[in-house]
Swiss-Prot record:
Chain residue ranges for the region called Disordered: 52-131, 162-224, 285-437, 451-470
Protein purpose: Has a role in the initiation of DNA replication. Required at S-phase checkpoint.
Keyword Nucleus: yes
CDD domains: RecQL4_SLD2_NTD
Organism lineage string: Eukaryota, Fungi, Dikarya, Ascomycota, Pezizomycotina
Biased composition (Acidic residues): 320-330
Name of the protein described by the UniProt record: DNA replication regulator SLD2
Residue spans of biased composition, Basic and acidic residues class: 418-431
Keyword Cell cycle among UniProt keywords: yes
């Protein structure tokens, strides 16, 4: 059989087998035919065998011949035509196996992630910076062109004595006319002027001359981490997406969508109820039926709140300024509440009540007929406490020097004035009057030295840290 006949027969067998497989799948609920199903049908199994044989022949005929199967005669003729080669050198080591181009082409390319996507360098050096500002590729280049070396006086022209060319009067500018009118000094020669300009400190730049600064001047600017305001780049609002809140963040007090929908539904229901009530009233009015009075809904409160209403919180601040002039608020017991006052520091010094010592008039002093001893005794009795009182005062001073005021204000002893009535009843002696006593400035009780007789004494006794030596 020729190649065309085998191909036609192969195509016929393949069409028959495809048709049988399709019918088998339709009869068996889409199940494909297996080996057992093919062996059970002898006709189909024979067609499979014949189809495999024909396919094998076609592939064998179309396969190319390998170069190793060439005839020896052709090889000999080719060797005769070529230039004879030198004798091969003997290799001491085992030669490596050479791979053919076909094998290299057929090798699979490893599909690792390194070859799928481009990657940068694995190690990056330090970023070049100057005063905190990252330098780019062109910032590190010198300001001038590096192709030509600059000399110090390379731009200076030769100072050759020559007749200066006459400048045209049309080229004279307004500035030159003004300077000429002001009487400027004699201009320097051109050679000297350009030569000295290389060593003169440059003048301050004017506002009109200032242009866009070059990248080399960025190094003198304020570093980025010390700037107070960083200029942000332009924001492209076209492709902005609505920011979605993170699920782990706590939501605010805003109403959710479901709550808003429920509120809208409730408003609609209330509106429909009102419309239905209005329609019902209109129908009843047309029919002549009187409307029953509406019942007011009273809240069913079993137990009222025992706490007082505090609209501004527990501190009970005044709601308005008018409330300040009102009466004080009453507590739950009916009594006015105590005004809260911030407590300060306690007393740091001892409290002393200084009572005034009234001086008797001259008329009263003229009636005093007591002896000097009795008068002194009365005055001492007024200013000096008894022995027990002195002991009590000393003991209290030893316990605490900063106790309450009650413990340090000794009760004055009530001394009855003797014989005051007898003096009034006695007749006045004629002609003789007692001279008025002059009271000293130190007669006040606070300036009188008291002779306190106690076991320890006013100074704490002889013992202790501050005791006197004997």
């Amino acid at each position: 059989m020729s190649i065309t006949e085998t191909e036609q027969r192969c195509n016929e067998l393949r069409n028959d087998l495809k048709l049988w497989e399709k019918n088998f799948a339709a009869q068996n609920d889409g199940r494909k035919a297996g080996r057992d199903d093919i062996k059970a049908n002898e006709e189909i199994s024979n067609k499979y065998k014949e189809y495999n044989k024909l396919r094998g022949k076609l592939t064998a005929q179309s396969a190319p011949q390998t170069p190793s199967k060439r005839t020896a005669s052709r090889k000999a003729t080719r060797d005769a035509e070529r230039t004879p080669k030198a004798a091969p050198k003997y290799q001491t080591s085992t030669p490596l196996k050479r791979k053919r181009a076909e094998e290299l082409a057929s090798e699979p390319i490893p599909q690792s992630p390194e070859f799928l996507s481009p990657q940068g360098p694995s190690v990056i050096g330090p970023t070049p910076q100057r005063d905190g500002i990252v330098l780019g590729l062109f910032d590190m280049l010198p300001a001038g062109t590096p192709s030509k070396r600059r000399a110090v006086l390379g731009d200076v022209e030769l100072n050759i004595l020559q007749t200066p060319s006459r400048r045209s009067q049309e080229a004279a500018s307004e500035t030159s006319l003004e300077s000429r009118a002001r009487g400027e000094r004699t201009p320097v020669s051109v050679g000297k002027r350009f030569m000295l300009n290389q060593f003169v400190t440059p003048k301050k730049r004017k506002m009109e001359e200032e242009g866009t600064p070059s990248s080399t001047t960025r190094g003198l600017a304020t570093p980025a981490f010390l700037r107070r305001g960083n200029l942000l780049g332009p924001i492209d609002e076209a492709d902005e997406t609505t920011p979605r809140p993170a699920p782990w963040k706590r939501r605010g007090l805003g109403r959710s969508l479901s709550a808003m929908i429920q509120a809208m539904k409730k408003d609609e229901d209330d509106k429909l109820d009102e419309e239905a009530d209005i329609m019902r009233e209109m129908e009843m009015e047309e029919a002549g039926i009187s409307m029953p009075p509406k019942k007011l809904r009273v809240p069913q409160i079993l137990v009222e709140d025992s706490q007082a209403a505090m609209p501004l919180g527990p501190d009970r601040g005044l709601e308005t300024e008018e409330d300040e002039d009102e009466e004080p608020e009453l507590g739950p017991d009916g009594k006015p509440r105590r005004v809260w006052k911030k407590k300060g520091l306690k007393r740091q010094t001892r409290r002393v009540i200084m009572r005034p010592n009234f001086i008797k008039s001259k008329l009263e002093s003229a009636l005093q007929l007591h002896d000097d001893s009795e008068d002194d005794q009365d005055k001492v009795a007024e200013t000096q406490a008894t022995g027990h009182a002195a002991d009590d005062v000393d003991s209290e001073d030893d316990i605490s020097d900063y106790a309450s005021d009650v413990s340090h204000t000794p009760k004055q002893r009530k001394v009855q004035k003797k014989k005051t009535e007898e003096v009034k009843d006695q007749p006045k002696e004629g002609g003789v009057k007692t001279a008025a006593r002059k009271i000293k400035a130190t007669a006040h009780a606070n300036f009188r030295r008291l002779k306190i007789k106690s076991s320890t004494g006013a100074k704490g006794g002889a013992k202790g840290k501050f005791g006197r030596r004997r």
